[in-house]
Amino acid sequence: MDVAPNWYLALSAVLFTIGTFGVLFRRNAIVVLMSVELMLNAVNLTLVTFSQSMGDPSGQLLVFFSIAVAAAEAAVGLAIVIAIFRSQVTVDITEINLFKH
């Protein structure tokens, strides 16, 4: 059973939209970081879909590098959130003021 590429692209658009709303409307820094990761995975799904439909594996290779960069970004982002939490005792983006000290 083959699934049409349009379904994958629709799923990617839904995931990207959910991630965008998470970045725009959430205040928790960890949830915002997770929303950015969701957006990156939506882009990866789009790359794999177009790569598969065109028959060119270079898009899938680009996704492997993108996953590695996303993992590093998540690790650095989480480390920054933990450091801010230790100094500010909050992960609420509206309450964090790094220029205060």
Curated annotation (Swiss-Prot):
One of its GO terms (biological process) is ATP synthesis coupled electron transport. The chain crosses the membrane at residues 5-25, 30-50, 62-82. It is found in: Cell inner membrane. Pfam families: Oxidored_q2 (PF00420). GO terms for cellular component: NADH dehydrogenase complex; plasma membrane. Keywords: Cell inner membrane, Cell membrane, Membrane, NAD, Quinone, Translocase, Transmembrane, Transmembrane helix, Transport. PANTHER family: NADH DEHYDROGENASE SUBUNIT 4L-RELATED, NADH-UBIQUINONE OXIDOREDUCTASE SUBUNIT ND4L. NDH-1 is composed of 14 different subunits. Subunits NuoA, H, J, K, L, M, N constitute the membrane sector of the complex. Belongs to the complex I subunit 4L family. This is NADH-quinone oxidoreductase subunit K. It comes from Salinibacter ruber (strain DSM 13855 / M31). The lineage of its organism: Bacteria, Pseudomonadati, Rhodothermota, Rhodothermia, Rhodothermales. The gene is nuoK.
